[in-house]
Amino acid sequence: MAALTRDPQFQKLQQWYREHGSELNLRRLFDADKDRFNHFSLTLNTNHGHILLDYSKNLVTEDVMRMLVDLAKSRGVEAARERMFNGEKINYTEGRAVLHVALRNRSNTPILVDGKDVMPEVNKVLDKMKSFCQRVRSGDWKGYTGKTITDVINIGIGGSDLGPLMVTEALKPYSSEGPRVWYVSNIDGTHIAKTLTQLNPESSLFIIASKTFTTQETITNAETAKEWFLQAAKDPSAVAKHFVALSTNTTKVKEFGIDPQNMFEFWDWVGGRYSLWSAIGLSIALHVGFDNFEQLLSGAHWMDQHFRTTPLEKNAPVLLALLGIWYINCFGCETHAMLPYDQYLHRFAAYFQQGDMESNGKYITKSGTRVDHQTGPIVWGEPGTNGQHAFYQLIHQGTKMIPCDFLIPVQTQHPIRKGLHHKILLANFLAQTEALMRGKSTDEARKELQAAGKSPEDLERLLPHKVFEGNRPTNSIVFTKLTPFMLGALVAMYEHKIFVQGIIWDINSFDQWGVELGKQLAKKIEPELDGSAQVTSHDASTNGLINFIKQQREARVQ
């Protein structure tokens, strides 16, 4: 594929931006088109609620949207989409298919990898998960002293942690009959130590989530958990009742003491950051119940079908992707804020920080050449309204343009005080996108200060600080209620957005070589931290840091 910057459709878009980009003014666009909302919004109607994507508060015209859709066609988005769904090995650096869509393929149509339908294997693992969940949640599965399981501890890192953690937090209202869940990921001993102090070994079930069963952080934490458990249980055979594995390495799992019957498999065509739909989601299913886990899969499958079959100009993931391309590659925006107005979604931005940045944080194209344009943005965010009292100042009046996605459910899980809390939340959600779009003109600010009785001197002094330029772009994503189905649909929507952007940039969104170099160097440094001998084998900075750490290790601290 030709480089993006040499694509005639992209050059046409850039030319339009150079000639007209500075003239785009959201206030004027809304004044000129009273139907702008209808022209630039999309409603997705499912049997489990609706999703409204309002992208009218973006710096776009109908011409811009047409050019963006033409760019998607020119870059081969439709053909690439089919290649993914058909099980072709689009992860070309690792020679793997990319089939998280198969994990939630509720229509059960055949999906082939190397000529073999993967769906029987997918369904077999789902059936095994269902049976296991029913045994644990019903109390049929007992610990070594005969107690039922009250706590499930997922030990994993990256994709084996962020997805299940985000989902179990988001679906807390659906967990009333399930065990508590805990997530341990960090190699920092504080994480496992603090967690274990709150647990009873007799009623704890550990899930060790590691495809290879060799991930250093995960296996170190798992061994620490096993050591803690055996201090109480004494008998190593008791491990089988309290530890299960999400892995493909039967030998290592057996060596650890886990019964291979309690090993849940997944496949090399499941990328870590797309794995919550697989056996990696076992902690989700245990916490909220397998029926709700299936609803999560069904919501994602609904979005998969929408993404695969809907024309690009009405396709929610495609539109989100194209708007991102517009801001990153024409306006030069470097970050993207995800701002969910729902406390249950407090890990949503962190989840897609990995989903987006590990997928599209690349500078090498499929042909092995360096890109000459920007790729993946820095993704960040916090729940509303907390963020309003933290970083929105910079979004409103800072020197950087930060495109934002605002998300909110119409119905709350907690309509306390006759819905007062949620009404205030909704009002703030609506006010922020209007404020970012409209801003406040000099005349409006002056009238406001005059009405407040400010003296002419105070008025002139304060006036420039009270002006908001506005013209800050946002998407509003409003959905009926945060149910398992709806969460599945929202997550899949953003997954496909990331995929589309990767295709347009001609990068591989499904490998992560960038995490390897640091791990290699850490293995070399680890033995150098032993003893007190000065280290001189690195650059001056790294040597200095190692030697300072060695010197301070035994220092007495008051």
UniProtKB/Swiss-Prot annotation:
Main EC class the enzyme belongs to: isomerase
Q: Which reaction does it catalyse?
A: alpha-D-glucose 6-phosphate = beta-D-fructose 6-phosphate
Modified-residue entries (Phosphothreonine), positions: T109, T250
- Any idea of its EC number? 5.3.1.9
Q: Where does D-glucose 6-phosphate bind?
A: G159, S160, S210, K211, T212, F213, T214, T215, Q354, E358, H389, K519
Residues found modified as N6-acetyllysine: K12, K142, K454
Annotated GO molecular function terms are: carbohydrate derivative binding; cytokine activity; glucose-6-phosphate isomerase activity; monosaccharide binding
**Keyword Ribonucleoprotein among UniProt keywords:** no
- Modification sites for N6-succinyllysine: K454
N6-malonyllysine is found on: K454
What would be one Gene Ontology cellular-component term for the protein? cytosol
Question: Which PROSITE patterns would you find in this protein's record?
Answer: P_GLUCOSE_ISOMERASE_1, P_GLUCOSE_ISOMERASE_2, P_GLUCOSE_ISOMERASE_3
Residues that the record marks as modified (N-acetylalanine) are: A2
Q: Which GO terms describe its biological process?
A: gluconeogenesis; glucose 6-phosphate metabolic process; glycolytic process
Residue numbers bearing the Phosphoserine modification: S107, S185, S455
Q: How is it modified after translation?
A: Phosphorylation at Ser-185 by CK2 has been shown to decrease enzymatic activity and may contribute to secretion by a non-classical secretory pathway. ISGylated.
The catalytic residues are E358, H389, K519
Which residues in this protein are found as N6-(2-hydroxyisobutyryl)lysine? K34
Q: How does it assemble?
A: Homodimer; in the catalytically active form. Monomer in the secreted form.
Task: Quote the function comment for this protein.
Answer: In the cytoplasm, catalyzes the conversion of glucose-6-phosphate to fructose-6-phosphate, the second step in glycolysis, and the reverse reaction during gluconeogenesis. Besides it's role as a glycolytic enzyme, also acts as a secreted cytokine: acts as an angiogenic factor (AMF) that stimulates endothelial cell motility. Acts as a neurotrophic factor, neuroleukin, for spinal and sensory neurons. It is secreted by lectin-stimulated T-cells and induces immunoglobulin secretion.
Task: Identify its protein family.
Answer: Belongs to the GPI family.
**NCBIfam families, from UniProt?**
PRK00179.1 (NF001211)
This protein is called Glucose-6-phosphate isomerase
